[in-house]
Amino acid sequence: MAKEEAIEKDGEVIEALPNAQFRVRLENGHEILGLLSGKMRMNYIKILPGDRVKVEMSPYDLSKGRIVYRYKN
């Protein structure tokens, strides 16, 4: 069985939570829990409320996602 493709959406960080977790509001208005990806942690990329980010979500659980990119302002 092939692995399902991740869904990529853009959003804005609303709130920073403990353990590199963030509340993210997507462009369609939904709010999800965003976790910082491992490569972003390794490269010390900081995320602050108000930042625009790209989130990957699994088609099986649309309430959580992985933050994979922070857009430059």
UniProtKB/Swiss-Prot annotation:
Residues of the S1-like domain: 1-72
UniProt record similarity statement: Belongs to the IF-1 family.
Described purpose of this protein according to its UniProt entry: One of the essential components for the initiation of protein synthesis. Stabilizes the binding of IF-2 and IF-3 on the 30S subunit to which N-formylmethionyl-tRNA(fMet) subsequently binds. Helps modulate mRNA selection, yielding the 30S pre-initiation complex (PIC). Upon addition of the 50S ribosomal subunit IF-1, IF-2 and IF-3 are released leaving the mature 70S translation initiation complex.
Cell compartments where the protein resides: Cytoplasm
Annotated PANTHER family: TRANSLATION INITIATION FACTOR IF-1, CHLOROPLASTIC
Assembly: Component of the 30S ribosomal translation pre-initiation complex which assembles on the 30S ribosome in the order IF-2 and IF-3, IF-1 and N-formylmethionyl-tRNA(fMet); mRNA recruitment can occur at any time during PIC assembly.
Organism of this sequence: Salinibacter ruber (strain DSM 13855 / M31)
NCBIfam families per the UniProt record, alphabetical: infA (TIGR00008)
Protein name per UniProt: Translation initiation factor IF-1
